[in-house]
């Protein structure tokens, strides 16, 4: 019985270490992509070719912010003692939907539905920032 208790106390620790190492690797990968995206943006700004559309540059900037938000989420995970704050997921969702609307705005109906989804996420963000749901220190 004591051996089972010891094993059940070690397993969560090993899983947390594995999760943390995986998140660190994902974080470094995202930093590499963030640097690459920043290089692409600055290259387009200073050496803008006439063939490069500002539309694609806007896509690159929004992708940059998605990388940035995921990195901030991982940093916040470690700062808040292994807890993912809900509001960071909502920020990422809002940014991703905005990027999608900018990239694919061919249908007015889908744009309206996606705008409604953003409105719902903003309402969820408002609720997440109330004292009832706030867990961050």
UniProtKB/Swiss-Prot annotation:
Pfam families given for it? PsiE
Keywords carried by this UniProt record? Cell membrane, Membrane, Transmembrane, Transmembrane helix
- Topology relative to the membrane, per the entry? Multi-pass membrane protein
GO BP term, pick one: cellular response to phosphate starvation
Which residue ranges traverse the bilayer?
Answer: 13-33, 55-75, 82-102, 108-128
Q: Which GO terms describe its cellular component?
A: plasma membrane
Domain of life the protein comes from: Bacteria
Q: What protein name applies here?
A: Protein PsiE homolog
């Amino acid at each position: 019985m004591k051996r089972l208790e010891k094993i059940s106390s070690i397993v969560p620790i090993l899983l947390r270490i594995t999760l943390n190492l995986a998140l660190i690797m994902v974080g470094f990968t995202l930093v590499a992509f963030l640097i690459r995206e920043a290089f692409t943006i600055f290259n387009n700004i200073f050496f803008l070719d006439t063939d490069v559309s500002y539309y694609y540059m806007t896509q690159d900037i929004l992708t940059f912010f998605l990388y940035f938000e995921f990195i901030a989420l991982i940093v916040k995970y470690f700062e808040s003692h292994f807890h993912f704050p809900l509001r960071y997921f909502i920020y990422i969702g809002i940014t991703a939907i905005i990027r999608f609307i900018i990239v694919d705005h061919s249908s007015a109906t889908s744009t309206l539905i996606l705008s409604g989804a953003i409105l719902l996420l903003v309402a969820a963000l408002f609720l997440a920032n109330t004292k009832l749901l706030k867990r961050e220190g």
